[in-house]
A protein has these predicted regions:
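Aromatic- and acid-rich polysaccharide-binding/catalytic face
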Residues: 150, 197, 214-222, 254, ...
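Active-site clefts of carbohydrate-active enzymes
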Residues: 299-308, 327-365, 394-408
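Alpha-helix capping and helix-loop boundary segments enriched in small/acidic/polar residues
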Residues: 188, 231-235, 307-314, 359-366, ...
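N-terminal secretory signal peptides that target proteins for export/translocation
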Residues: 1-8
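Extracytoplasmic, non-cytosolic globular domains
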Residues: 236-247, 316-328, 344-347, 356-380
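Non-catalytic accessory regions flanking glycosidase/transglycosidase catalytic cores in CAZymes
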Residues: 12, 24-217, 233-264, 285, ...
Length: 425
């Protein structure tokens, strides 16, 4: 047994990074005097005891998942660089999830916005498919050894029951609710929705091969239990059934699941799982909907108190535990993989504020190390098969350096949090 007094951060020597994993969040309170700068008022030493002779087993590689609101950033200068760095963590084993993959537009990104113009209609109302921008995004992933975690959404303008207004102009100073525009509504024609998804999935199979695409994840929408979905729960389940049936029509061995709910989903999640396991499928008329994985989101809740940020790790772990317990309550899902499809210190990567000041420094990295070390323990205790925890952070192209967004890099400069994933790898 060894004992060491330390005030080191994750950016210190490699051994200290290991201490963060073993000791968790206790390093957050350490001072900064080792850097030659004064320790914060009220700082205190932290003693960490490590038994190097005892092995607790391997840490499951749940960290291999990342994502962002803005899919088009992946094909831009700094985005390509960062995708390459993610792929290098563990080639062919890292996955990327993005919102807005089916949104209508010219492909120019903005905060919390992206588009591919994959679906339009001609003057006769006939579908026109264009995979050019989508191919560019997925080609970038594959060239760097990253695979898609395909989020089927959002609604193309030509299919939305309420297409106007469509593209939002959200800024961090605006109300979050301003993002919910025409893309968030149900389709005016579920058959056309299904055919769009089928044609997209078939195109992916033809372009990348069935053996490759069956290793991807496919799920419908994002957080349909909050206003990201402007329809009813029943309409979402219908949307999901038609999408899953379409993917499986293109590739019967495709890995499909969901629903990537906000939080554990509570009763909304239970209703979804009941439908998938025992309900009548809206698309096929048969019993149930294929469910190869179950996904939900878990977020922390940082606050700004007395001049410093107080991280809310308990909120994230509590939400994860709630989600695990919901899945565990279904015996049929005992061995079904679970993915926390967004697993972060808080809920808005593009938002700014004093409570989010942790993002540029080592508090973000320490928090991530502590959280990802504990999630497998919770999953094991609750009796579920945790396969992944997805970090919803990427980069923001053409923004000021260290602008306060939740990201892994800023204009090509890696942030400390990226070193956590290098350590995990």
């Amino acid at each position: 047994m060894t004992s060491r007094k330390t005030g080191w951060s994750l950016l210190g020597a490699g051994g200290c990074a290991v201490l963060v994993l073993l000791a968790g969040g206790s390093l957050l309170a350490a001072g900064a005097d080792h850097l030659g700068t004064p320790a914060a008022a009220g700082a205190f030493p932290v003693n960490i005891r490590v038994d190097a002779s005892r092995s607790a087993g391997d840490l499951r590689p749940i960290w291999r998942f990342f994502g962002a609101d803005e899919p088009n950033y992946a094909t831009m200068k700094s985005g390509r660089k960062l995708i390459g760095e993610l792929g290098a963590l563990r080639t062919q084993a890292v996955y990327f999830r993005a919102h807005n993959l089916l949104c209508s537009g010219d492909g120019r990104p903005a905060l919390k916005w992206g588009s591919t113009n994959a679906f339009t209609e001609d003057t006769q109302g006939r579908p026109v498919y264009d995979w050019t921008i989508l191919d560019g995004i997925f080609d970038t992933y594959r060239a760097q050894g990253v695979r898609p975690y395909v989020e089927i959404g959002f609604m193309p303008k030509a299919l939305s029951i309420r297409p106007e207004p469509y593209q939002h102009r959200w800024t961090p100073a605006a109300k979050y609710e301003e993002i919910y525009t025409g893309w968030a509504y149900p389709p005016k024609d579920y058959a056309k929705w299904a055919e769009l998804v089928y044609q997209w999935a078939r195109h992916c199979v033809e372009k990348y091969g069935a053996a490759e695409v069956e290793r991807w994840y496919w799920e419908t929408w994002n957080e349909a239990n909050i206003p990201y979905w402007q329809g009813t729960p029943e309409e979402f389940r219908k949307l999901h059934d038609f999408a899953v049936a379409a993917v499986r029509r293109a590739l019967p061995t495709a890995r499909v699941g969901g629903p990537d709910s906000a939080g554990s989903g509570g009763q909304w999640m239970r209703d979804f799982l009941d439908h998938c396991l025992r309900g009548t499928n809206y698309a096929t008329g048969g019993r149930g909907t294929p469910l190869d994985f179950v996904s939900f989101h878990a977020k922390g809740a940082p606050t700004f108190v007395a001049g410093h940020v107080r991280m809310g790790i308990a909120n994230e772990l509590r939400t994860a535990d709630e989600g695990f317990r919901i899945v565990a309550s279904y015996p049929e899902l005992k061995h079904t993989p679970v993915i926390i499809g967004e697993c972060d210190p808080e809920g808005c990567a593009a938002c700014q504020g004093p409570q989010l000041a942790y993002r540029n420094g080592t508090m973000y990295s320490s928090y991530t190390a502590a959280t990802f070390a504990r999630l497998p323990e919770l999953a094991e205790r609750d009796g579920v098969n945790l396969e992944g925890a997805l970090t919803w952070a990427f980069e923001f192209e053409d923004q000021p350096y260290f602008a306060g967004f939740r990201s892994l890099a800023t204009n090509g400069i890696d942030k400390p949090v990226l070193n956590v994933f290098r350590l995990f790898s």
